[in-house]
């Protein structure tokens, strides 16, 4: 896809002090198309999709530099073929060194290849190209890992062994409900602590994308799944804006791999999948990564109205990518629930799971004691300190939390304490 960079017109752009002439456009991808006839006939169309748009859209590109734009508006072939009879020999030598069977290509043959690509691109319907997504993903992956690329390929698409989550316990009522229903998608409604995570993971059949709404919650889920699957071959990655910092103690490859295609389980927020909704740069690689996978949308009820709209659109696209979608929630407005159920294909396609009323009545996880005043809480704090327990005190005003922190600092000067509130920046 980059062999067109051999052209002197590209090479001169790399020289110090080079100034490009106004309106001059040379796209190395177009020059790469001159070598199409080296491929088998059945490979050509896929390779065109990989090459022709891996930097710019094929048609009506925002900069008007798409492959078809340039062909319509200027002598694109004439520009890119310059000195081809000279530089093509070097290009063929590189391709031969990479194992491709080559033969000399005349300017006439290069023109035939160019016109074949033009005709093919005009024949395409609107939509995304999985071949472009694969090329972009592979290109970025290899560029990031360099000589360590091959050693990491064996684990790139390992299907996770999720048998760990077959565990059962009476405290977790969802753990006793079977997950072998043949319907493709899942909607689970159950209280926090009922075993939704295990249930959703047991419903998965392939690689998993596990989404949660908040960075802190996906950090915790990443740690949990990584620990649960530590004795398997599963590759578990974390994807959010600060995820590289989260695994700063890991090896360099792990930090690099987070950003690229592959992994048995990826833990992320829906924002990381938003590129497939907006069609922003690189969305094809994300779509190629998601295609045919299991996607868990957990705690979906916590999103704002705007994010819920994006999530609904994400679900539509996931279905188009043949994903299995599993939704988990503690509570959800009935309108949103039925909207998602309809999107997923209704009861014929969705395994709906809700705990029976008698289970919910007995579902007591905690005992809450009401303290009449602050003075009585000191006994509770003293008892917790003596037992070595951690203590969380929650106030509904920043000023109140600051005053309480000062009091605790005076009462327990030797204990480690932390004050957290929204005015910290």
Model segments located where?
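N-terminal helicase ATP-binding lobe
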Residues: 2-425
């Amino acid at each position: 896809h980059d062999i067109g960079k051999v052209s002197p017109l590209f090479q001169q752009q790399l020289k110090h002090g080079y100034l490009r002439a106004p309106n001059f456009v040379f796209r190395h991808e177009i020059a790469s198309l001159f070598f199409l006839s080296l491929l088998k006939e059945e490979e050509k169309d896929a390779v065109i999709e990989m090459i022709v748009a891996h930097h710019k859209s094929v048609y009506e590109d925002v900069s008007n530099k798409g492959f078809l734009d340039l062909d319509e508006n200027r002598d694109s072939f004439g520009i890119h073929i310059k000195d081809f009879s000279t530089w093509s020999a070097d290009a063929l030598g590189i391709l031969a060194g990479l194992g491709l069977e080559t033969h000399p290509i005349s300017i006439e043959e290069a023109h035939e290849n160019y016109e074949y690509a033009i005709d093919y691109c005009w024949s395409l319907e609107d939509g995304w190209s999985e071949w472009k997504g694969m090329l972009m993903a592979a290109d970025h992956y290899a560029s990031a890992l360099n000589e360590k690329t091959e050693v990491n390929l064996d684990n790139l698409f390992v299907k996770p062994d999720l048998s760990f989550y077959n565990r059962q316990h009476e405290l977790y009522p969802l753990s006793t409900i079977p997950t072998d229903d043949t319907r493709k998608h899942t909607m689970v409604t159950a209280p926090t602590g009922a075993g939704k995570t295990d249930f959703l993971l047991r419903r998965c059949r392939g690689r998993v994308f596990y989404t949660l709404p908040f960075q802190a919650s996906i950090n915790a889920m990443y740690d949990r799944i990584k620990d649960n699957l530590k004795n398997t071959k599963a590759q578990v990655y974390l994807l959010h804006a600060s995820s590289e910092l989260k695994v700063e103690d890991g090896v360099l490859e792990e930090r690099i791999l987070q950003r690229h295609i592959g992994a048995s389980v990826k833990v992320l927020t829906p924002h990381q999948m938003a590129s497939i909704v907006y069609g922003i740069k690189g969305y094809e690689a994300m779509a190629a990564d998601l295609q045919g996978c299991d996607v868990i949308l957990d705690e979906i009820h916590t999103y704002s109205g705007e994010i819920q709209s994006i999530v609904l659109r994400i679900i539509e696209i996931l279905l188009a990518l043949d994903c299995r979608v599993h939704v988990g929630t503690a509570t959800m407005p009935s309108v949103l629930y039925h909207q998602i159920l309809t999107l997923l294909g209704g009861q014929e396609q969705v395994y709906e799971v809700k705990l029976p009323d008698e289970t919910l009545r007995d579902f007591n996880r905690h005992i809450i004691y009401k303290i009449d005043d602050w003075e009585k809480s000191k006994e509770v704090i003293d008892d917790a300190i003596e037992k070595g327990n951690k203590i969380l005190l929650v106030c509904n005003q920043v000023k109140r939390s600051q005053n309480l922190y000062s009091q605790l600092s005076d009462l327990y000067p030797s204990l480690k304490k932390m004050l957290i509130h929204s005015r910290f920046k």
